[in-house]
Amino acid sequence: MAPERLRSRALSAFKLRGLLLRGEAIKYLTEALQSISELELEDKLEKIINAVEKQPLSSNMIERSVVEAAVQECSQSVDETIEHVFNIIGAFDIPRFVYNSERKKFLPLLMTNHPAPNLFGTPRDKAEMFRERYTILHQRTHRHELFTPPVIGSHPDESGSKFQLKTIETLLGSTTKIGDAIVLGMITQLKEGKFFLEDPTGTVQLDLSKAQFHSGLYTEACFVLAEGWFEDQVFHVNAFGFPPTEPSSTTRAYYGNINFFGGPSNTSVKTSAKLKQLEEENKDAMFVFLSDVWLDQVEVLEKLRIMFAGYSPAPPTCFILCGNFSSAPYGKNQVQALKDSLKTLADIICEYPDIHQSSRFVFVPGPEDPGFGSILPRPPLAESITNEFRQRVPFSVFTTNPCRIQYCTQEITVFREDLVNKMCRNCVRFPSSNLAIPNHFVKTILSQGHLTPLPLYVCPVYWAYDYALRVYPVPDLLVIADKYDPFTTTNTECLCINPGSFPRSGFSFKVFYPSNKTVEDSKLQGF
């Protein structure tokens, strides 16, 4: 393509996005795109502009250095995707993105005025934590077909079925009765026995005497869509529902190839055709999930030996072992006992060379394992405990709780917490519908876009690291390792499983096959 035409196309593309190029920058860009065919040019320019917008820009005048960095990012060799096949991402390594309401997009932390996260959070971090939870749900709800404003000139029947979200400030500012209002807010109990709805603009007292609850577990500190009428400073609720969920494909259609999940890839692995091909070709790949692996129990170790013997001819890609790793928590000898138990486990693994050399082992700590209290995200088991095991089993990773696993284009979130009981105990009203508890539970987690939609006194969180507990965009597989009965359910194109407590459920565990996204229930009882 003629350099002048190329230059003109590039300038126009940048101008359409509100960006201007300096002379040196356009000269460099024209040279870099010289070998690109006319058919590919538009796609390539869009990728470069996206990469430019991801950088911290001081103005809309783009320098050469910014364009150089963007071109370099877009021209990375496809062969580099080989190192992106399998990655374990700890909670403290997850990238943080902040939603910008003005630009209607997620910005990396560096492009915002937020400080770097710190375990010793400030009051601002605590307020920001709830504000960000609200903002994510608000933008998701606003884009849902029921809440998008009707198109001008549309049929009256179409516009009649649309809803409009109101803020609490709007309600409180009215001196007359407001009928049929829908508000997105968080349920709080500011006074004992009295529930309030809270959003960034204010709080309003609720009257729940006539409220109908749709399916889900409605706990304090969860976000709801409340429908009702407002009179005399009280919001009388007719119905409670959760914010609508959204498949990850829909989220990515709006926000492009941002890598929300984490890992070495600059862009979302979902866009990689090469990784997708590898995933489909490797039909033997499997992930084995176990929870409550009590390594101090002889019977548990025997069952693990039987399992390894069974899998030895065709070793799984990965064993994900979740805590607690001791049946007797705490105590002065717990650390030494756990070191000895891990030594015994290493002995068993070494008995099966195929598994020892081929399979990866991921250890996710449980709530009663040695560590820093019960605040989430929880760091890995201490190196002093795991050192010897890691030397003997090199393909082992001791990670955080929760953690994320990326395999080819699939995203897996693993969380070890006895969450079902906690959420049932803290319900504003226990569900009366015939839906099974796991269905209520999974719907709640995905609707909230968060792993722990509970008050902080029930499930404490490091305020500045709350983003590490997000379930947005929705992963392909969500593993909630809970002592509740094992279950497998699908919601919003997300497969949700609970392997159950290994010793308490007759030695049951779950096996996931990424090539066809299926889960197999397995049990070692009777062996």
Curated annotation (Swiss-Prot):
Q: Which Pfam families match?
A: DNA_pol_E_B (PF04042), Dpoe2NT (PF12213)
Domain of life, per UniProt, equals Eukaryota
Q: Which UniProt keywords apply?
A: DNA replication, DNA-binding, Nucleus
Task: Provide the GO biological process annotations.
Answer: DNA repair; DNA replication; DNA-templated DNA replication; error-prone translesion synthesis
Molecular function in Gene Ontology: DNA binding; DNA-directed DNA polymerase activity
Compartments (UniProt record): Nucleus
Q: Does the keyword DNA-binding apply?
A: yes
The extra comment attached to this record reads: In eukaryotes there are five DNA polymerases: alpha, beta, gamma, delta, and epsilon which are responsible for different reactions of DNA synthesis.
The record describes its quaternary structure and partners as:
Component of the DNA polymerase epsilon complex consisting of four subunits: the catalytic subunit POLE and the accessory subunits POLE2, POLE3 and POLE4.
* Protein task: Accessory component of the DNA polymerase epsilon complex. Participates in DNA repair and in chromosomal DNA replication.
What name has this protein been given in UniProt?
DNA polymerase epsilon subunit 2
Q: Which organism is it from?
A: Homo sapiens
